[in-house]
Amino acid sequence: ARSDNFVRL
């Protein structure tokens, strides 16, 4: 998912 990409921080 796109949000998951930055949520990983």
Swiss-Prot record:
Keywords recorded for this protein, A-Z: Amidation, Neuropeptide, Secreted
One term under GO cellular component: extracellular region
Compartments it resides in: Secreted
Keyword Secreted: yes
UniProt keyword Secreted, yes or no: yes
Leucine amide, modified sites: L9
Subcellular location, principal: secreted
GO biological process terms, semicolon-separated: neuropeptide signaling pathway
Protein purpose: FMRFamides and FMRFamide-like peptides are neuropeptides.
Family: Belongs to the FARP (FMRF amide related peptide) family.
Protein name: Extended FMRFamide-7
Species assigned in the record: Namaquaphasma ookiepense (Gladiator bug)
